């Protein structure tokens, strides 16, 4: 070993300090734009979501356009109607799309609609939810819907805890490997509950 080190035994270095946990950032909605032109254009022309569906969520304060980058902002609220979650989706129709939850968002409070009957539809993304409502517009407001903003089941479980009348769950996750894996996991969680 001395031959490799050139007759030096080397130096010892102190171990790195353990990484400190940073406190979670407080949740804050991105500032809204003065209008929603780009969001309406993107959702209606690019994604073919109906004007009625977009307008419903915009008037409810659950969908708007952010001022800085003109992203779609999908707002999730708690049981008191206080915003606790926001999902950003770029309105860029060319190039790579951008999707992210705003820092400090609570995953259990993602974008949702609470209806009066016992049926809950579960989606991966808010735009999947809006597209479904466009395809099946008849009395859609009677049912409940939640977008997981990913494949975690926290938002669905929160909806079921808050709304005890919800008895039937329809999983509408993507038909890809992550979506199908999540669907199986969530189905098992529901059967165990």
Q: Where do the model's predicted regions map?
A:
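Short, small/acidic-rich helices and loops at N termini and domain boundaries
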Residues: 1-2, 56-62
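Active-site pocket-lining segments that scaffold enzyme catalytic pockets across diverse folds
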Residues: 34-38, 42-47, 51, 61-62, ...
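Acidic beta-strand-to-loop metal/phosphate-binding motif
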Residues: 122, 166-178
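Acidic, metal-coordinating catalytic cores used for nucleic-acid/nucleotide bond scission
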Residues: 150-154, 173-184
């Amino acid at each position: 070993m001395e031959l490799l080190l050139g007759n030096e035994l080397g130096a010892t270095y102190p171990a790195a300090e353990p990484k400190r946990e940073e406190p979670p950032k407080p949740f804050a909605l991105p500032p809204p734009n003065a209008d929603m032109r780009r969001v309406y254009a993107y959702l209606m022309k690019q994604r073919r979501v109906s004007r009625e569906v977009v307008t419903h969520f915009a008037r409810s304060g659950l969908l708007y356009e952010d001022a800085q980058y003109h992203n779609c902002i999908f707002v999730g609220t708690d049981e008191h109607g206080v915003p606790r979650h926001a999902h950003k989706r770029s309105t860029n129709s060319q190039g790579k799309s951008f999707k992210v939850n705003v820092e400090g968002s609570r995953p259990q409070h993602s974008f949702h609609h609470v209806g009066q009957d016992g049926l809950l539809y579960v989606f991966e993304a808010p735009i999947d939810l809006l597209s479904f409502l466009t395809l099946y517009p008849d009395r859609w407001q009677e049912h409940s819907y939640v977008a997981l903003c990913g494949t975690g089941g926290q938002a669905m479980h929160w909806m079921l805890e808050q709304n005890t009348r919800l008895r039937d769950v329809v999983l509408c996750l993507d038909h890809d490997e992550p979506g199908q894996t999540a669907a199986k996991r969530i189905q098992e969680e529901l059967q165990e509950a």
